[in-house]
Amino acid sequence: MNIKNNINNRAINILNHETLVDINDLMIYSDILINDYSTTSVDFSITRKPQIFCLPDHQKYISYVRLDNDYLNNLPGSYVFSFKELIDLLNAVLMDDGEYSRKYRDQRINYIEKYYDVKNISSCSKFNQFINTII
């Protein structure tokens, strides 16, 4: 599937973020996340869907924002530095039959484990206790 040829044929739907109230709704309906440095990727990782990180300003960004030393290698998806690279990678991901998602499975799991307490099975009761303390 070639993105440039199919946008006009509506084979690819690009949703306007202003039409949805909650970004979590958008994540459910999205097949892929094109992201930058946003923590949205952490939440999107739970969906097990592919992610691409578009970082055209990376050199400038790291000059004023401190990132983990191994930031790029720990992302749950590939990163690109130009729009052309983005289009090429997006075309490849859309045609690969899930291989891209399988390739980044371990990074995605590590990402989720780093930012979520996935082993906590008492979240509901803790939330209930919290609500009771403020009522």
Region locations from a protein language model:
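Catalytic binding pocket for nucleotide-activated donors in carbohydrate/polymer assembly enzymes
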Residues: 3-10, 39-115
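Donor nucleotide-activated moiety binding/catalytic core segment of transferases
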Residues: 1-42
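Residues within well-ordered alpha-helical secondary structure of globular protein domains
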Residues: 29-32, 92, 133
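Short, contiguous acidic/charged loop-to-helix segments that flank catalytic cores in large enzymes
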Residues: 15-22, 74-77, 115-118
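C-terminal alpha-helical cap of glycosyltransferases
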Residues: 117-135
